[in-house]
Amino acid sequence: MTKQTLTQLEQHDLFLRRHIGPDSSQQQEMLNYVGAESLDDLTAQIVPESIRLSQELSIGDSCGEAEGIAYIRGLAKQNQVFKSYIGMGYYGTQVPNVILRNVLENPGWYTAYTPYQPEIAQGRLEAILNFQQVSMDLTGLDLASASLLDEATAAAEAMALAKRVSKAKKANIFFVADDVFPQTLDVVKTRAECFGFEVVVGPASEAVNHELFGALFQYSNRFGQITDFTDLFAELRAKNVIVTVAADIMSLVLLKSPGSMGADVVFGSAQRFGVPMGFGGPHAAFFVARDEHKRSMPGRIIGVSKDTRGNRALRMAMQTREQHIRREKANSNICTAQILLANMASFYAVFHGPQGLKTIASRINRFADILAAGLQAKGVSLVNNTWFDTISIKGLDVAAVNARALAAEMNLRFDADGIVGVSLDETTIRTDIDALFEVILGAGHGLDVAALDAQIVAQGSQSIPASLVREDAILSHPTFNRYQSETEMMRYIKRLESKDLALNYSMISLGSCTMKLNAAVEMIPVSWPEFANMHPFCPLDQAKGYTQLIEELSSWLVNVTGYDAVCIQPNSGAQGEYAGLLAIRKYHESRGEAHRNICLIPQSAHGTNPASAQLAGMQVVVTACDKQGNVDLEDLKAKAAEVAENLSCIMITYPSTHGVYEETVREICNIVHQHGGQVYLDGANMNAQVGLTSPGFIGADVSHLNLHKTFAIPHGGGGPGMGPIGVKAHLAPFVAGHVVVKPGRESDNNGAVSAAPYGSAGILPISWMYIKLLGSKGLKKSTQTALLNANYVMKKLSEHYPVLFRGRNDRVAHECIIDLRPIKEASGVTEMDIAKRLNDYGFHAPTMSFPVAGTLMIEPTESESKVELDRFIDAMVSIRAEIAKVEAGEWPADNNPLHNAPHTMADIMDSAFDSRPYSREVAVFPSAAVRTNKFWPTVNRIDDVYGDRNLFCACVPLSDYE
């Protein structure tokens, strides 16, 4: 009979023990090795006493998985999922189950990282390339990005691109047609204010009356009207105006492409291609432009290159445009995008194929025709006389219609001017039209859907003018015409998945990325219809479950960060930075100090920081770091004093980007505050703070939190992410608001930074579950274990590689940096060689050349077991032995396992391999662990230079299949 208590048998800490990799005996063994008695002792050795919290978090106790699921199920049931006809960029969709199960709910897809290591990411790179092809085909333009965050932020990016490339250099006006979605205009205005642009809003036809650098039009507009802009666009382009268009992706299946009308840039949401509404996100935006604007495109772009064997290989193209390289001169601060959702949308297009998409789009349009015909037959007046899916109605008794709609559990769109809008979608069926007739007309309307349909078939539909009917073929590439059976689709998805290395195969030790476990129990609620199928603009009393979840999560984040308020809206870390800096900017303006526009940034900062500062209209001044990588206090004091009159803020990361807790962080905060500035603390490394210290306690004023790092939202192969910001009380009135949804906060009337009021709300249940299951003690122990794992790896590797930075007591924080520059000097072996060789050992490489060129930054999260850590350490030790053979001349510098890595099946089958000075076994089975669980890269090292010099960013030509 066991002597355990009932409390012990209930195992409330079971999730904690499953989330943390090393078990108690392994932890003790590791503690003994690093020279600490306990996790608390190790914490005391690492974290400066001056910033250590004296009290535990007040989140509550941990709970079991079943208990957590039951609680969040209760929240979900509080949501009332009405049939939505609101539209405005968010629509019901049918997620094909083959995609739901094999992509959205598959860790092989959702736990991968951004494909910086393309040799082990060919699967999702192909899926993203398909997304780009879909985007180009439907818009009629030349080059597409891999995705942006949402339609509204894509509009802001389009405005910025227009200013960069327009030949109307003296113009400072961006025109926005007055019939765009209101949330799009909201986000554009917010961004324009930072850039100093003037936004003029008016009827589309009036655009030619202004001196513009760019203009934005909606196709179809928010009332559903479809307009042929060909002549207007020609007139604008003749005046050097960059024409941008927000377009509906489903409508483009049937409509003439904006590119063929003369648009320069076309963007929109891909949500209705098989991605749930999710109360606002996450969704991928598409962004497509003319080839001449390619160097000014925001976001990532996938291109076709070749590997060392001359085979086709995919990679991220033109990376020199991005923020991590160009910093404040970058086109955008975009880092995380929406790759998982872009992949879902691309698979949706592949699964349905061009004919299937035409059938879906035609069905939606037919239902809109039937609805319009029935209403007009009863004397109802329509605002629009053309449409794809949206009917706008005037002259109704709005209160009566709304009452009947709510009674029928449906949401219509009610504009302030009395117009009632109805947007139909893929989920619409015949009985929905009957129900809409009853809601709009009242009972006894006498209309018959079948009869109306027969009438339309006989007379022909006039809803899409003949001049606007698409005549060119779409999606003619074989990929979109092969996989319409579920068997073939399932195998295609699996074939791509098998080319990629994700967390479900091995540890991904990327520094500054926190690739921790995304537990299955955390992911389960995401696809529940109560969370997945809610429209972000539905009445808030229908979203009580979401509201409570967001309030609880926000209160927990307030507790964790030491701030006073949280804004959930930013839908990426980069957006969080932008939102936080905007709050600082607005705060200074409220005090009559709008001239404060200088942002101090240490030279070691991530490139997103200066890019975000530039986006917020600030001027960047770089401060020096000392030889230990710390902020140089004397230089900071001098710079702060020099720019004191105009100092807006400083952006710092903590622990610092070089992986240590700087002892002087409070002094840094004090220096900036003394000169009238605010402190922005980048939350990228929050995984080393939770439960031990906090930004608010340290002295910062605002931070963003990467929920896709610290709080367990998966990286999705390059998104989604969430970047909510925490702020001190004095900044709370200046966080983002929203033009459509106003929950009654002081910040309601502020400009938005994202399309939806709560950002990518659909993935918030993941972080809610993570915090709920771990509780106060579990969160702290997770942080402490992350420190233990990092110091264990650091000490083991320090016997073979120099460790570049260490903090107090010779410790690191949650990551360590090994210096490969001496190795490169002695042997010619580069950090790239080591990164690619790790692929042969079954590992994704650590972060390369950040924050110091010629280094690797390693972050082993708390979720990795000692067994996996040792396997990684053994691989690095083995690689060091291989380097020694190059140093000794045993292997030539240009023909060795590192230089030739990664190795593929094709390599070892090639008879020419015999000429290499190492064996096939050394090439592909360099360790015993690999023999039992081999990951095979499918391409050799990719030629980056060739890919950029021969830019090709679409599916390979048909001739490649002949």
UniProtKB/Swiss-Prot annotation:
What does this protein need as cofactor? pyridoxal 5'-phosphate
* GO MF assignments: glycine binding; glycine dehydrogenase (decarboxylating) activity; pyridoxal phosphate binding
* Gene Ontology CC: cytosol; glycine cleavage complex
Residues bearing N6-(pyridoxal phosphate)lysine?
Answer: K709
Q: Which superkingdom does the taxonomy of this entry point to? A: Bacteria
| Keywords, alphabetical | Oxidoreductase, Pyridoxal phosphate
What's one Pfam family here?
GDC-P
Reactions performed catalytically: N(6)-[(R)-lipoyl]-L-lysyl-[glycine-cleavage complex H protein] + glycine + H(+) = N(6)-[(R)-S(8)-aminomethyldihydrolipoyl]-L-lysyl-[glycine-cleavage complex H protein] + CO2
In the Enzyme Commission scheme, what number(s) does this protein have?
Answer: 1.4.4.2
Question: What does the record list as GO biological process?
Answer: glycine decarboxylation via glycine cleavage system
Q: Where is the signal peptide?
A: none
Q: Which family does it belong to?
A: Belongs to the GcvP family.
Q: Any idea what job this protein has? A: The glycine cleavage system catalyzes the degradation of glycine. The P protein binds the alpha-amino group of glycine through its pyridoxal phosphate cofactor; CO(2) is released and the remaining methylamine moiety is then transferred to the lipoamide cofactor of the H protein.
Quaternary structure?
The glycine cleavage system is composed of four proteins: P, T, L and H.
Xref: NCBIfam families: gcvP (TIGR00461), PRK04366.1 (NF003346)
Protein name as annotated: Glycine dehydrogenase (decarboxylating)
Q: Which organism is it from?
A: Shewanella oneidensis (strain ATCC 700550 / JCM 31522 / CIP 106686 / LMG 19005 / NCIMB 14063 / MR-1)
> Which gene does this sequence derive from?
gcvP
